[in-house]
Swiss-Prot record:
Coiled coil: none annotated. Its cofactor is heme b. Its main location: mitochondrion. It comes from Cricetulus griseus (Chinese hamster). The keyword Metal-binding applies. Component of complex II composed of four subunits: the flavoprotein (FP) SDHA, iron-sulfur protein (IP) SDHB, and a cytochrome b560 composed of SDHC and SDHD. The gene is SDHC. GO terms for cellular component: mitochondrial inner membrane; respiratory chain complex II (succinate dehydrogenase). This is Succinate dehydrogenase cytochrome b560 subunit, mitochondrial. It is found in: Mitochondrion inner membrane. Pathway: Carbohydrate metabolism; tricarboxylic acid cycle.
Length: 169
């Protein structure tokens, strides 16, 4: 017990003595603060009228760029839609048939129903077909610029045609 007490007192005294020496020896006065550096950086950039890099205005929009953004967007929308559908099935009262009967009782026109079906099925078809395109790219096929544009147009046309066909069912 005495050994533990002696060890504790020795360490405590030694630590207090060394900490003051270490802190004083390594203390370096700061030349500028982070806020001053940040203000200097932004003043320099605004005075030279440089845009923040990479700036969106320097890029020319292309079909593959837009399709990549849309592929990500449809993926987020589809996963969000499936999650909302699952949560609503769990939390809302009644069953699926009662909600289907409610929609039928609204007497919506066929044009509105087909349009709604198209809006619901197009993101799924686009995301699926573009995903197949990406899988083909993963195999190392169709990576030349002309083939990328051709496959992009093909995906868009097939997505529209298949969505129209599925919405007509």
């Amino acid at each position: 017990m005495a050994a533990l007490l002696l060890r504790h007192v020795g360490r405590h005294c030694l630590r207090a003595h060394l900490n003051s020496q270490i802190c004083l020896r390594n203390a370096v006065p700061l030349g500028t603060t982070a806020k001053e550096e940040m203000e200097r950086f932004w003043n320099k950039n605004t005075s030279s009228k440089r845009p923040v890099s990479p700036h969106l205005t320097i890029y020319r929009w292309s079909l593959p760029m837009v399709m990549s953004i849309c592929h990500r967007g449809t993926g987020v929308a589809l996963s969000g839609g499936v999650s909302l559908f699952g949560l609503s099935a769990l939390l809302l009262p009644g069953n699926f048939e009662s909600y289907l009967m409610f929609i039928k009782s609204l007497c919506l026109g066929p044009a509105l129903i087909h349009s709604a079906k198209f809006v619901l099925v197009f993101p799924l078809m686009y995301h699926s077909l573009n995903g197949i395109r990406h899988l083909i790219w993963d195999l190392g096929k169709g990576l030349s610029i002309s083939q990328v544009y051709q496959s992009g147009v093909a995906v868009l046309m097939l997505a529209v045609l298949s969505s129209v066909g599925l919405a007509a069912m």
